[in-house]
Amino acid sequence: MSKADYKKKFVPGALMVPKTLKKSMAFKAAQNFEAPKELILTGYCTPADDQGDKPWCAAYAAANYAENLLWRKRGYKKEIDPAPLYQYAKTIDGDPDADGTYLECTLQALLKYGYFDSKVSKVKTIGGGLFGNLNAANDVKYAIHKYGVVMAGFNITDEWYKPSAKGVIVGKEGAKPQGGHAILLVGFDENGFIIQNSWGGDYAHEGFVYITNKAFNEQFMYAAFLTRALDGMY
């Protein structure tokens, strides 16, 4: 697909970003945490979804999030419909008439529908530079290492519509900001992070794209995930 075709899949503003993050949800890496050189969880990802022109990127990220963790926990694939997640999120996000929603509201939807135990799992968030956190990449790596895949929002650029031939978002100079977009972070290495997007299986490498540390640090807004969602998996 062309750059213009992928641009049609992006709905500006479809990811809502809170002005402040609740202190009760704030998450930081442990002081003694040293990230492994590589941690990749793509083996538990279901095939890439295609959100089309629907402003549901956060709900698709939440569905992919649950699919990944439940496959790890229960040992089988289960594809989850993002529509009910989006619909419930819109009842609690405070702006029912606007397109898009917050990451944390879609996680609340997963708890509402019983995918994870709400008595055990709690929603946590990690702010990026937008919230004054200059160590966000390490915090995100710690969350992936400790709790599994992580939902994240980026202020994407038009480079996302056509990554490099190797499927990499490098953070090109002069790339034009497009607005917020939600994805799933499914791994990392020393040079960047692996993303599962919701723009179909033809995007980048079968729906997955790699973002360099440079681009991550420039574009990352915030992340959200559940603690202890995998409790009992062993």
Predicted stretch roles:
Residues 1-234:
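Catalytic-core signature of thiol
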